[in-house]
Amino acid sequence: MENLKKMAGIKAAEFVSDGMVVGLGTGSTAYYFVEEIGRRIKEEGLQITAVTTSSVTTKQAEGLNIPLKSIDQVDFVDVTVDGADEVDSQFNGIKGGGGALLMEKVVATPSKEYIWVVDESKLVEKLGAFKLPVEVVQYGAEQVFRHFERAGYKPSFREKDGQRFVTDMQNFIIDLALDVIENPIAFGQELDHVVGVVEHGLFNQMVDKVIVAGRDGVQISTSKKGK
């Protein structure tokens, strides 16, 4: 599995060239993309500026001497490469398993090209088997939790080391055990209207390309948006 992730990450780095502003994703597959960008800077003299999607990726990039700017210092991002937890046939996805969904969506939005790198196990017919992360402000989080409970969404606060997990933006994450999401776009809009919700892990029709590593090699699928 790790080898497949590495294949996808290295392939994605081929979409990066000199002079670009590059969004560096977060997660186990995006990790290999960041490593490859670091290698190309060191060995090939690649010249780019990067923005990161989490404190974890910032630390990795700094260790590789990748030049960084904050998202507020750039007008746009040429290409962002990130992982995904699930991807359906309509190019909708669930992200946020690593807890960085808000920053990931902030960086993805001004990106001219948005690419996901995944192994073939992440491809699904319908989203929802992977718990959907919802980032909520700490104030009133229990109210949001009870709202989800009443709606039958089987919520649980994400925890780490026996404490509630706190994101880089100092928010909590409520994971929803939905089993299947029949209409991701409508459900995303529903979550957008819940007061106290900062962002959710549904990335609907945002991605341009999905690079999939599997037993038969690396395949690249292009969405309608990316054509």
From Swiss-Prot:
It is an enzyme of class 5 (isomerase). Keywords: Isomerase. It catalyses: aldehydo-D-ribose 5-phosphate = D-ribulose 5-phosphate. InterPro entries: NagB/RpiA_transferase-like (IPR037171), Ribose-5P_isomerase (IPR050262), Ribose5P_isomerase_typA_subgr (IPR020672), Ribose5P_isomerase_type_A (IPR004788). Pfam families: Rib_5-P_isom_A (PF06026). Pathway: Carbohydrate degradation; pentose phosphate pathway; D-ribose 5-phosphate from D-ribulose 5-phosphate (non-oxidative stage): step 1/1. It comes from the Bacteria. Belongs to the ribose 5-phosphate isomerase family. Homodimer. This is Ribose-5-phosphate isomerase A. The gene is rpiA.
